[in-house]
C-alpha cells in the first residue's frame, strides 16, 4: 500500500511592512546616507528574528518528514525563503525541488515593491517525479503567485 504525506505550510515571514519597504527603497537609492542607519538596523533585526523562527519550524517539519523516508512526501507552501536558504538546504537532504526538476525561468512567486523572490516551493520525495511545475502569474488574489505541478511515482 502506498503512503503519501503532504505537509502544506506557511513558514514565518520577515513581517516587512510599508515603512520597511520605504526604508529599503531609501537604502537602495542612497546607500551611503548615514540617516539610513536606523532603517538598516531595523531591517537586519527583522531578518534575523524571522530566520531564527523559520529555522525552528523547518527542523520540526524535516523531523516529521524524515519518519516517512522511502515513502511519498510532499512539502509545499510559502516558505518565505529562497532556494539558497537554510530551509531549502535542510529539506534538500531528503527531498527534491519540483521547480528545479520541471519548471522554467526564475519561478518568482513573490513580486512586490520591486522585489522578486522564489519563496513558494513544492518539494517531493526522491521516488517521485514532477511535471510542468508552474508559477501562475495570472492569479492576482494574493501577494504571492501560486505554484503547482503534476507529480507521479517513478
Annotate the PLM regions:
Residues 36-49:
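Short glycine/proline- and acidic residue-enriched helix-loop micro-motifs
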Amino acid at each position: 500500500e502506498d503512503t503519501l504525506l503532504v505537509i502544506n505550510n506557511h513558514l514565518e515571514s520577515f513581517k516587512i511592512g510599508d515603512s520597511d519597504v520605504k526604508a529599503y527603497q531609501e537604502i537602495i537609492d542612497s546607500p551611503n546616507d548615514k540617516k539610513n542607519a536606523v532603517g538598516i538596523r531595523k531591517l537586519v533585526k527583522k531578518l534575523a528574528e524571522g530566520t531564527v523562527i523559520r529555522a525552528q519550524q523547518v527542523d520540526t517539519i524535516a523531523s516529521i518528514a524524515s519518519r516517512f523516508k522511502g515513502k511519498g512526501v510532499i512539502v509545499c507552501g510559502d516558505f518565505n525563503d529562497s532556494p539558497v536558504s537554510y530551509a531549502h538546504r535542510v529539506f534538500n537532504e531528503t527531498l527534491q525541488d519540483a521547480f528545479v526538476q520541471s519548471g522554467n525561468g526564475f519561478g518568482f512567486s513573490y513580486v512586490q515593491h520591486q522585489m522578486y523572490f522564489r519563496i513558494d516551493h513544492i518539494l517531493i520525495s526522491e521516488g517521485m517525479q514532477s511535471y510542468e511545475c508552474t508559477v501562475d502569474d495570472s492569479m492576482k488574489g494574493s501577494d504571492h503567485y501560486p505554484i503547482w505541478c503534476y507529480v507521479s511515482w517513478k
